[in-house]
């Protein structure tokens, strides 16, 4: 199965050990690691514990980096490390009769941990971290995603709900590894299972936006240096593999597919991009931007605006933190249109190879926003 933001919902297998995520030196920026709260679990059908903030993540790569930043930052973390997963608590409360998922490795609704964080104002906030296995583009579709969002808000009593994870770039200025933070979104649906939801073409915009005061410090001192994994030899190897699996790519060169947001010379320092009020685009299909057609969106992803819609109904503040795991892909080479299947494969390959590292940046950016509360 080709892996991308749409398909990466299954537990991944051991694939060897490439470069790990580093131990996080919180003291370097004058802070300490989040503290894990134990003894809060009464079984998968019990209500969720109370929390000030809920932070949701989605894919396997995102979840791995999420745990590393918020739970286990004192050791290195490889993409195929899995021992940490068993400490997460399953949550399956109030699943309607007949509601199911297409993913036997990740049953509804998902898994969680509870942590406490010290903020810059010397307050302590309690955060429920949630690995959501309920997706807009997979059964139980919009109805399931709306229900779990409502339960997360109602049971925790949170004042903020965040959704964080990987995203497609909407413009060439969004480099691989950058993180876009927004409080607005627009929903665009195609699946018949979702069209009856009444959510198609709905837009949301939050009234609150997080403080940005720690962003520059965190990106400078803690972000992953993408040039340590995105090199021309690595890109050449990926391109050779692309040509092997897609004969249409044989007419292309590597330079045809490496545009500015993927060029290693532009990736030394990833950045956090605040986008207060600029909507991301939420779809129930895998969408890769072409040219300037998607520039009006902050990023492209597949769940968030539904989270925001439910939160808005419940008068709960919401925010989205999306790391660029697959930048905008060139649409033409030497004046000729590049086939969509080639662009899709290349986008998926970039996500598969680098999404773990971009997700680390995304989780750190979220930590920075929460700590500045």
Regions found by a protein language model. Name each.
Residues 2-346, 353-373:
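Intrinsic-disorder/coil detector with helix-boundary
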